[in-house]
């Protein structure tokens, strides 16, 4: 198993709030909690940047992290990430922040310690671009949106 350095910036993590964990043995994402000092009221349509109290240094250029919304919050409450998906590069060392967007029509209360997002580590392949004047033909060619059908 690959180990990633994580720095706890908020002393409540591991004491008042649990350390990030995988909820089940089959979970792909580590739950991320909001580490604010007070509850946050998010009005309809409002976005806000909230701290997680954690910094991460992946260090391996063949890995990145993606910050993804928790599905229940978006479906049931209209609370999603303002940037939809956050990409954490391997050389970033700052605090993980969550851009939270209330796309519902009612106020939403976020309490300190609430799980609002999840972090998934993914492989990265950096490519070298090869400039060509033509592509080798393929069966699909340049067929785009809907070209391959629905069935």
UniProtKB/Swiss-Prot annotation:
Gene3D superfamilies named among the record's database cross-references: 2.70.40.10
One BP annotation, GO: dUTP catabolic process
Record pathway: Pyrimidine metabolism; dUMP biosynthesis; dUMP from dCTP (dUTP route): step 2/2
InterPro entries per the UniProt record, alphabetical: dUTPase (IPR008181), dUTPase-like (IPR029054), dUTPase-like_sf (IPR036157), dUTPase_trimeric (IPR033704)
Residues annotated to bind substrate: 70-72, 83, 87-89, 97
Keyword vocabulary terms for this entry: Hydrolase, Magnesium, Metal-binding, Nucleotide metabolism
Matches recorded under Pfam families: dUTPase
GO molecular function, one term: dUTP diphosphatase activity
NCBIfam families, per the entry: dut, PRK00601.1
Protein name: Deoxyuridine 5'-triphosphate nucleotidohydrolase
Name of encoding gene: dut
């Amino acid at each position: 198993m690959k180990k990633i350095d994580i720095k706890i910036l908020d002393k409540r993590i591991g004491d008042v709030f649990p350390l990030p964990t995988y909820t089940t043995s089959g979970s792909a994402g580590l739950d991320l909690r909001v580490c604010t000092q007070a509850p946050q009221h998010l009005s309809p349509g409002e976005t806000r940047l909230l701290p997680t109290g954690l910094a991460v240094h992946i260090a391996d250029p063949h890995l990145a992290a993606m910050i993804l919304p928790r599905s229940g919050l978006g479906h049931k409450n209209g609370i999603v990430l303002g940037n939809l998906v956050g990409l954490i590069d391997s050389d970033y060392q700052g605090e993980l922040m969550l851009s939270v967007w209330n796309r519902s029509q009612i106020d939403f209360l976020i309490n300190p310690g609430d799980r609002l997002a999840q972090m998934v580590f993914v492989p990265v392949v950096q490519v070298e671009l090869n400039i060509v004047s033509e592509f080798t033909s393929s069966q699909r060619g340049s067929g785009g949106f809907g070209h391959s059908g629905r069935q």
